[in-house]
């Protein structure tokens, strides 16, 4: 399948640079995945499309302040470090700039010296394995010394870093936010529960690979990045009960979708408590085993994410909806508007 099949024209001014003052004031496009019918709503009206007995599945990952600025021991040269993935113990896969200054054995000091790192291995494209030493608890030190890494298409500085977190974020470990969840407020979640809609949580730590462009002509040849996921006993039990009672499972975000589909694919459609790494790549032709609907933002042309939503709603329906979104001046990408596919 050719990558150009997932291209569309997007004016740059439609890429949202800042979040709206109120999370649930975003626009919501509702797309019927069978008929292709489109409706235009406000996000807080999502409630009218959810039924008693349905289940919304949210990703409770929390974005870590993964960008660090340090100095090379001995020379004092400035080094930028971006944490990508925790390995064993205090070792992390990272991206460093300038990479040529960081070789095996290089030591880097951050802030007042409470955090230090030693390079123990080199990878391609500026990747380095760093081993950290610190005083206290690693994530607390990181909160004080690190900065929030925003997607490359967001050029403006974020006034309030919490706006790049969901209101239910709790499991620290992501390099990027699961952005479909940014539209929910505590009040909206309470209203959803009051209607008899279940809310379940999974965890998938989003890696920067989510922004990596597809560089192959035939999408089947794309090498998908792996991300850590986890499902608890409580969530697995709830999802199996919802399925047995005829409720719909609606994923909030492509990250929740990939977690649910990974687990259901391994267990004949059932949900089981487990953790692991997933590199599932969902594109047209994929048969969904877990979800009935999806809440998601508007994605980049030719991205793996637009391929995923095309698998669920049909490529032609998605491209028609995206063209309508451009015409109606919807806001795109991380801080943009949302789509409900049901």
UniProtKB/Swiss-Prot annotation:
Superkingdom field: Bacteria
Recorded GO CC terms: cytoplasm
Keyword field: Cytoplasm, Queuosine biosynthesis, S-adenosyl-L-methionine, Transferase
InterPro entries cross-referenced by the UniProt entry: QueA, QueA_dom1, QueA_dom2, QueA_sf
Associated pathway: tRNA modification; tRNA-queuosine biosynthesis
UniProt-listed Enzyme Commission number(s): 2.4.99.17
Principal location: cytoplasm
Catalytic activity: 7-aminomethyl-7-carbaguanosine(34) in tRNA + S-adenosyl-L-methionine = epoxyqueuosine(34) in tRNA + adenine + L-methionine + 2 H(+)
Keyword set includes tRNA-binding: no
GO molecular function terms noted in the UniProt entry: S-adenosylmethionine:tRNA ribosyltransferase-isomerase activity
Subcellular location: Cytoplasm
GO BP field: queuosine biosynthetic process; tRNA wobble guanine modification
Quaternary organization: Monomer.
Function statement: Transfers and isomerizes the ribose moiety from AdoMet to the 7-aminomethyl group of 7-deazaguanine (preQ1-tRNA) to give epoxyqueuosine (oQ-tRNA).
Family annotation (PANTHER family): S-ADENOSYLMETHIONINE:TRNA RIBOSYLTRANSFERASE-ISOMERASE (PTHR30307:SF0)
Similarity-based family: Belongs to the QueA family.
Protein name: S-adenosylmethionine:tRNA ribosyltransferase-isomerase
Organism, scientific name: Geobacillus sp. (strain WCH70)
The gene coding this protein: queA
């Amino acid at each position: 399948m050719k990558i150009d099949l997932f291209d569309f024209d997007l004016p740059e001014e439609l890429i949202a640079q800042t979040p709206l003052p109120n999370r649930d004031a975003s626009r919501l496009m509702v797309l019927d995945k069978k008929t292709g019918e489109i409706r235009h709503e406000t996000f807080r009206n999502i409630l009218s499309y959810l039924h008693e007995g349905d289940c919304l599945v949210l990703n409770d990952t929390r974005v870590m302040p993964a960008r660090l600025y340090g100095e090379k021991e001995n020379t004092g040269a400035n080094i930028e470090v971006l944490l990508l993935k925790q390995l064993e113990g205090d070792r992390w896969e990272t991206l460093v700039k300038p990479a040529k200054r960081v070789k095996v054995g290089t030591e880097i000091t951050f802030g007042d010296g409470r955090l230090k790192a030693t390079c123990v291995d080199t990878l391609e494209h500026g990747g380095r394995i760093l081993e950290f030493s610190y005083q206290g608890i690693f994530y607390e030190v990181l909160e004080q010394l690190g900065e929030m890494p925003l997607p490359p298409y967001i050029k403006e500085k974020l006034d309030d870093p919490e706006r790049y977190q969901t209101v239910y974020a709790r499991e620290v470990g992501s390099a990027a936010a699961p952005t479909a969840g940014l539209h929910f407020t505590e009040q909206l979640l309470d209203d959803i529960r009051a209607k008899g809609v279940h809310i379940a949580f999974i965890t998938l730590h989003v890696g920067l690979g989510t922004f990596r462009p597809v560089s192959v002509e035939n999408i089947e040849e794309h090498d998908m990045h792996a991300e850590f996921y986890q499902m608890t006993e409580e969530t697995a039990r709830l999802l199996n009960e919802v399925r047995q009672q005829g409720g719909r499972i609606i994923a909030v975000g492509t990250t929740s979708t990939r977690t649910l589909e990974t687990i259901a694919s391994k267990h004949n459609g059932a949900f089981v408590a487990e953790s692991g790494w997933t590199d599932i790549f969902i594109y047209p032709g994929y048969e969904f085993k877990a979800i009935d609907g999806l809440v998601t933002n508007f994605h980049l042309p030719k991205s793996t994410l637009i391929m995923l939503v095309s698998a669920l709603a049909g490529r032609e329906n998605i491209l028609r909806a995206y063209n309508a979104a451009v015409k109606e001046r919807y806001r795109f990408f991380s801080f943009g508007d949302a789509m409900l596919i049901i």
